[in-house]
Amino acid sequence: MNTFSQVWVFSDTPSRLPELMNGAQALANQINTFVLNDADGAQAIQLGANHVWKLSGKPDDRMIEDYADVMADTIRQHGADGLVLLPNTRRGKLLAAKLGYRLNAAVSNDASAVSVQDGKATVKHMVYGGLAIGEERIATPYAVLTISSGTFDVAQPDASRTGETHTVEWQAPAVAITRTATQARQSNSVDLDKARLVVSVGRGIGSKENIALAEQLCKAIGAELACSRPVAENEKWMEHERYVGISNLMLKPELYLAVGISGQIQHMVGANASQTIFAINKDKNAPIFQFADYGIVGDAVKILPALTAALAR
């Protein structure tokens, strides 16, 4: 048997749902999708869900992760085994851990390939900081996976599809996560997974102010802007959602233009599937040039304005 009888899907990020649903179609006979509202439910059915389970009734001061109890109960009530697919977001990984505990299931994070053999999931993901690919065969009846962006193609919606909708009512967990405060952050409205052209900046850009040079190039060629992990996590120059690498975005654009990025393996894992890689770096020995199809050795601050002017003609 090369499929599960049932797969359960949940995405806290709507843009990741089409990819997860496409993977679900390949891995199971019946697709169940947990959603938070009616609009997401309608989208899930168009993407192939046979059953939609609307999570309802959570108090405003509680976290989505506290739906884990009722989600696990619902999964158990509809089969003695199954596959759970979640995005490899922070919330996805936290929810995966909670579901794994409640289902007595093995959990595998950041999956880059998934297959089913004899009713058991086989999962591949990066290990040793991206230096190798590990393969795991999950033996537990339930398997909980968080999926790296780009692992599956994106499912296409079909308005003619139909499915059944159910409501799953909130039940307060024995130990709850209570939200005590919220802090607004800059939202990322760009879906980098779908970008044809990507300009990505590293610390070699020099300063937060110099990122404007990359933004001007993006505008000239119709590209989207991304970054390396240090730019987002260490320097805080850009939002977390834009960094490319093993623990976040895995992109497959037609062009990936790396500006001031050294090219460590942890970053290149997220960019190496690009059709063409173009690198700009003042260090001629930077590892990025081993991956690049084209490269310029020089100061990005001087090269970017000239490149923008040439391409804007």
Curated annotation (Swiss-Prot):
GO biological process, any: carnitine metabolic process
Domain of life (superkingdom): Bacteria
GO molecular function: electron transfer activity; flavin adenine dinucleotide binding
Key words of the record: Electron transport, FAD, Flavoprotein, Transport
Keyword Flavoprotein: yes
Protein role: Required for anaerobic carnitine reduction. May bring reductant to CaiA.
Oligomer and partners: Heterodimer of FixA and FixB.
Protein name per Swiss-Prot or TrEMBL: Protein FixB
